[in-house]
A protein has these predicted regions:
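Extended acidic low-complexity intrinsically disordered regions
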Residues: 2-16
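Short, surface-exposed, charged amphipathic helix/loop patches that serve as local interaction elements
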Residues: 29, 34-160
Length: 160
């Protein structure tokens, strides 16, 4: 128990979990979201903004596999340069990194959801699990809603 937790007493301890969660409703379903501590938010930001090279490489291989057939027939649309493929001037390695960032953001935000069933955890949730359940449009909508409830509003930040 923390110093503040002790000072606020047993009733506070009983309600602490509720204090650190917020709700949002999406199509009639109520989702609970755990508000991350600052250190957790920092860790999420780091994980999202700097995906590991192994993940980027895996995604790169997946998205460029169909393009490899054009390696001997390069055109202005498909250009093979060192360790990258440019499609209409756009780097597929950069596209893979952006996809890794998006998937990490979605996964880390979904891990903030509080399961309804007692004893269930989302700590080991993967993007594949999320993708299996929701199309990308719904994933992005849920992430947007999570972002809204975990970010303080101007009024809350100002203290009025």
């Amino acid at each position: 128990m923390t110093k503040l937790g002790s000072a606020f007493g047993e009733k506070y301890q009983a309600k602490r979990k509720d204090l650190l969660t917020r709700l949002f409703v999406l199509n009639g379903h109520t989702f609970k979201v755990r508000i991350p501590l600052i250190s957790e938010s920092d860790a999420i930001y780091k994980k999202v903004s700097d995906p590991d090279e192994e993940t980027i490489e895996k995604i790169y291989q997946e998205i460029t596999a169909p393009l490899r057939q054009f390696e001997n027939n390069q055109t202005e649309d498909f250009e093979f340069i060192n360790d990258d493929i440019l499609v209409e001037g756009r780097s597929m390695r950069e596209a893979a990194k952006n996809k890794a960032i998006t998937e990490a953001r979605i996964t880390e935000f979904f891990k903030l959801l509080v399961p309804e069933m007692e004893g269930v955890t989302l700590d080991d949730l993967t993007y594949a699990d999320i993708e299996e359940e929701f199309p990308i449009a719904v994933q992005m909508l849920i992430v947007e809603k999570i972002g809204e409830v975990i970010s303080p509003t101007y009024r809350e930040a100002r203290g009025n």
